[in-house]
Swiss-Prot record:
UniProt EC number: 2.7.1.5
Taxonomic source organism: Escherichia coli (strain 55989 / EAEC)
Family statement drawn from the similarity comment of this UniProt entry: Belongs to the rhamnulokinase family.
Protein name per its UniProtKB record: Rhamnulokinase
Origin organism lineage: Bacteria, Pseudomonadati, Pseudomonadota, Gammaproteobacteria, Enterobacterales
Pathway assigned to this chain's UniProt record: Carbohydrate degradation; L-rhamnose degradation; glycerone phosphate from L-rhamnose: step 2/3
Amino acid sequence: MTFRNCVAVDLGASSGRVMLARYQRECRSLTLREIHRFKNGLHSQNGYVTWNVDSLESAIRLGLNKVCEEGIRIDSIGIDTWGVDFVLLDQQGQRVGLPVAYRDSRSNGLMAQAQQQLGKRDIYQRSGIQFLPFNTLYQLRALTEQQPELIPHIAHALLMPDYFSYRLTGKMNWEYTNATTTQLVNINSDDWDESLLAWSGANKAWFGRPTHPGNVIGHWICPQGNEIPVVAVASHDTASAVIASPLNGSRAAYLSSGTWSLMGFESQTPFTNDTALAANITNEGGAEGRYRVLKNIMGLWLLQRVLQERQINDLPALIAATQALPACRFIINPNDDRFINPEAMCSEIQAACRETAQPIPESDAELARCIFDSLALLYADVLHELAQLRGEDFSQLHIVGGGCQNTLLNQLCADACGIRVIAGPVEASTLGNIGIQLMTLDELNNVDDFRQVVSTTANLTTFTPNPDSEIAHYVAQIHSTRQTKELCA
């Protein structure tokens, strides 16, 4: 029997993991084993919100060394992370400045400035990327305006997964799927857009041409002396998660559920018309030249902050208590910028309810109920927008990632969207990371081939919509009110 051992490093905003995958060629079976899991989070440093990249690198190396200590010969390594954030290096490869996180406030107001100076439609036609106040385009502008003393020292700008690959291999790479999240890549050329780069203040020489997933960046030399290839996977974690989504047919949508919720569909062509612009739809790069037509939703970040502030450790107990409460008493817009990084999330949620003359969620369960109901309703709105954009309804929604373990939210989503939900796999980003490695090793033909492997090996759970649920009735009432207003307009 022929086995391949691939290691996926999957870094999220709240945690990271080093996972070992074992693929058996003859029976096309794939198993995952967690080698090392570690925390990630935001830090305050010199007035900025930052990432501790040294700690993350140490955790990555610890995980890789653990695999080697077991006597396992690694065939390849791949790294995926969140998007938009970057690390600056000088000519010697040493860091310049701080690895500032996207939740820092330094780019506040710059998105509106870019739209005014360059034109909102022109930016969108060039990049195809949604307008988010922390996109790399605005972060770089903030850097060059606020810290001009750093500019003479900068030789390279590496996005997060490329930085960690560089630290392992000494080789630089700019992977395409993650590069597209910057709002700096031209959607027609797949290269950096000179007009957008010029506005950002960044030097084009800081960047190399983006490479599509599947190339070998370089090699990591393990403690035993073996040279192990480090593969440029679809290094944006959502791009990897979509690869592992067992999408079946053109009427399947996906929801990558974690700190962020990313809802969308796959397409061979981007959508950059006025309808897409008005809905703030993004066209991020995917594997094999596909586009991830999607929309960002704030996701479980709100819950993570509530858990932290209220010091809640028993999430299953909280969900059980939440399930016993009536639905849709407290509704907020999770995508409101006020929730990006407030000083106190609980107070911010309560203030939003107070300002809209709603009851105030006080208990832990009420806050969680507010978040779950609000997310499910926003999922329904976004799914409707996506269906209108492409001119065809969806028949099923695949929820992948850590958030798909929340059975209450899965059912609320099915009920609010009125669509069958298939939950799983949980470790979608890790699996998609592994999938590209196996293709690079010539073990699999393409993404569709890999999805067949996922469908037969992953644990999937189906949630059927209940039209008689409270949230389904709430959605029906909203639609009825909207139709009445449209008729009277």
